[in-house]
């Protein structure tokens, strides 16, 4: 039980409370309203999770056009002005769907960062995001939650939550 839900093999030596100079982290939990009945939204969420976990055919594509998370994200980007936002989600397919759905809603300079890009293209997109006048939003698949640090980003959006708590820590640790 401890290995599954506790720190297990992860040791937390350098926590924010033990080190100085880090800004305080504030979690913003946002309940989202949906046009559909709760049962319809629940079915959509279950299908999305099944697809993310590889339980459904790759033929089924995400359709996030009317997803309340996209509506909220568009509003958030408008409210934040020029602040840099890092968004992390589970899969390449979801990254591309978020990019398409968001482009229909709000004009924003957004880069993508996922497994199907070459290493050079990922580096270019990360560099564009790092530039002062570059992308305001970087939409990453799970590959963006490991290895790279985006400390210059002002906000982190977790479009979905990983089932593994260590992966959640990895995502949060990008900023």
What are the residue ranges of the model-derived segments?
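Inter-lobe coupling linker of SF2 helicases/translocases
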Residues: 1-56, 68, 75, 80-82
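Conserved helicase motor "Helicase C" RecA-like lobe of SF1/SF2 P-loop NTPases
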Residues: 89-114
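Conserved helicase core region in the C-terminal RecA-like lobe
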Residues: 93, 137-144, 161-163
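Phosphate- and divalent-cation-binding pockets in alpha/beta enzyme and binding domains
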Residues: 94-98, 149, 167
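Conserved helicase ATPase core of P-loop NTP-dependent helicases/translocases
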Residues: 108-142
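A short beta-strand element within the Helicase C-terminal
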Residues: 148-161
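Conserved SF2 helicase motif VI
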Residues: 164-175
